[in-house]
């Protein structure tokens, strides 16, 4: 997968290219990341990249000419088929379904805004899609771009150590992940659930699915509203609710 970055701070992306899962993907040649700074396309000796907005108001906007030139250079490097994305609070909110959708693209160009944003005409003429990582304000688009890259890279074949990891992540099937345990078997009196030590893979799968459904119901119930549960899932969720109510009643009785 090829990803082009338009950013005033391309050095920030060393966190992606040098470390962790994405760093290994870059080293393996599975992920190719290139970056361009609008400053390198400024025409004055101060390398100016900001401009006052028409109509007044606080803050500055990214200057049109250096930004457009950087985008055009990235498009030329990418060749045909590159999707240009602007990281913006006004964009579609990124979720696992969106990540899966973006991962089908072989080429992405991510435009990271700064200051108060970019000229609307640049969005209209250069940007294919706008994406947001949440309803809050950040100083620029670099962190959202890194979030997008990290999440999308997990879908590239060969990036993860286990091919099933991406499909078993939280949200991959619309549910939160189940609890996980490792050694020691007992930690400060808390034991690993016996089913995980049983070696019965069918029961382990059933337990994990039940816990995933239950955790989603407890923490993110709105996610269940969009799911058509299978007969097995509905049964397991009902079991979890019954067990949870019993535990709550038991806890209240001890209080």
From Swiss-Prot:
Protein keywords: Cytoplasm, Methyltransferase, S-adenosyl-L-methionine, Transferase, tRNA processing
CDD domains hit by this protein: TrmD-like
Keyword S-adenosyl-L-methionine: yes
Residues engaged in binding S-adenosyl-L-methionine: 113, 133-138
Alphabetized Pfam families for the sequence: tRNA_m1G_MT
Cell compartments where the protein resides: Cytoplasm
Enzyme type, top EC level: transferase
One Gene Ontology biological process: tRNA N1-guanine methylation
SUPFAM superfamilies hit by this protein: alpha/beta knot
Reactions that this protein is recorded to catalyse: guanosine(37) in tRNA + S-adenosyl-L-methionine = N(1)-methylguanosine(37) in tRNA + S-adenosyl-L-homocysteine + H(+)
EC number: 2.1.1.228
Subunit relationships: Homodimer.
Family membership noted in the UniProt record: Belongs to the RNA methyltransferase TrmD family.
Protein name as it appears in the record: tRNA (guanine-N(1)-)-methyltransferase
Source organism per UniProt: Enterobacter sp. (strain 638)
Taxonomic placement: Bacteria, Pseudomonadati, Pseudomonadota, Gammaproteobacteria, Enterobacterales
Gene for this chain: trmD
């Amino acid at each position: 997968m090829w990803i082009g970055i338009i950013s005033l701070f391309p050095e920030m992306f060393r966190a992606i290219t040098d470390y962790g899962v994405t760093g290994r993907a870059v080293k393996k040649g599975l992920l190719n990341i290139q970056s361009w700074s609008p400053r390198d396309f400024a025409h004055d000796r101060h390398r100016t990249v900001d401009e006052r907005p028409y109509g007044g108001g606080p803050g500055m906007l990214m200057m049109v000419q250096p930004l457009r030139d950087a985008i055009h250079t990235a498009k030329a490097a990418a060749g045909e088929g590159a999707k240009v994305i602007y990281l913006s609070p006004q964009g579609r909110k990124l979720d696992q379904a969106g990540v899966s959708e973006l991962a089908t693209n072989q080429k992405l160009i991510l435009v990271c805004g700064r200051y108060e944003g970019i000229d609307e005409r640049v969005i209209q003429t250069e940007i294919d899609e706008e994406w947001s990582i949440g309803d809050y304000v950040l100083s620029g688009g670099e962190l959202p771009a890194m979030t997008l890259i990290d999440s999308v890279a997990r879908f590239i074949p060969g990036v993860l150590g286990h091919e099933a990891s991406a499909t078993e992540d939280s949200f991959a099937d619309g549910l939160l992940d189940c609890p996980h345990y490792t050694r020691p078997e007992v930690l400060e009196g808390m034991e690993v659930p016996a089913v995980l030590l049983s070696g019965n893979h069918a029961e382990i799968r059933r337990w994990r699915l039940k816990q995933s459904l239950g955790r989603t119901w407890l923490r993110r119930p709105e996610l269940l509203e969009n799911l058509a549960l299978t007969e097995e899932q509905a049964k397991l969720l009902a079991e979890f609710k019954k067990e949870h109510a019993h535990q709550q009643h038991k806890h209240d009785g001890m209080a």
